[in-house]
């Protein structure tokens, strides 16, 4: 924690147990639930939930043979406040749905030969769009339907979209445009209403490009 106004730093250390601190020194994305708890993605330590009121931690880590998170390398997280669902994207473990009311996990993974499954088990970002989720993966972007568990891969069959493989980050702006950070391909914008996909690549000859 850092407060730039007062130059106050607080360090949150790792530990061997939940009572001692974080489960991993490598942390990534975070979100906050309705109770003010911080949900922290880690690399190798699963998801850590930090209760700021009583300064305690809860770890969600993979446990073989039990209902648990599918992988401990966690890259993305999105909190559905209305339905009390935490959506968790993992590296090699697919997409996880944690129902906070029951504390049960449901895992969605890539299935060979099934076009309605995830395009990759490496999930890098999750953003909401209407009643669905836009999911960034190592193999493009898909529109995930939480009600059915089915994925619709976006623009992969189009000429403009074939080059989109590994996607690092997503953002939907106030006008409903989806912005896609594609590794090695620059930035794309996508309009759901028209299906228009536009690429903004790096051009060494153009100093005004990315």
Q: What does each model-found stretch correspond to?
A:
Residues 1-210:
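Carboxylate-rich, polar loop motifs that coordinate divalent cations or form catalytic acidic clusters
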């Amino acid at each position: 924690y850092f407060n730039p106004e007062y130059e106050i730093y607080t360090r949150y250390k790792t530990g061997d147990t939940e009572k001692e601190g974080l489960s991993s020194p490598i942390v990534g994305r975070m979100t906050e639930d309705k109770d003010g708890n911080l949900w922290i993605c880690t690399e190798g330590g699963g998801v850590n939930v930090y209760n700021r009121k009583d300064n305690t931690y809860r770890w969600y880590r993979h446990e073989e043979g039990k209902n648990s998170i599918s992988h401990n390398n966690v890259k993305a997280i999105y909190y559905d406040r209305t339905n009390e669902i935490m959506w968790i994207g993992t590296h090699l473990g697919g997409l996880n749905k944690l129902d906070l009311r029951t504390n049960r996990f449901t895992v969605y993974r890539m299935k060979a030969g099934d076009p309605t499954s995830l395009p990759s088990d490496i999930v890098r970002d999750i953003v909401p769009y209407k009643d669905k989720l836009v999911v960034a993966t190592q193999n493009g972007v898909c529109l995930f339907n939480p009600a059915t568990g089915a994925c619709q891969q976006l623009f992969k069959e189009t000429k403009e979209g074939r080059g989109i493989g590994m996607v690092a980050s997503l953002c939907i702006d106030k006008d409903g445009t989806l912005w896609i950070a594609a590794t090695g391909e620059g930035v794309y914008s996508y309009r759901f209403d028209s299906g228009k996909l536009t690429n903004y690549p790096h051009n060494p000859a153009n100093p005004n490009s990315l």
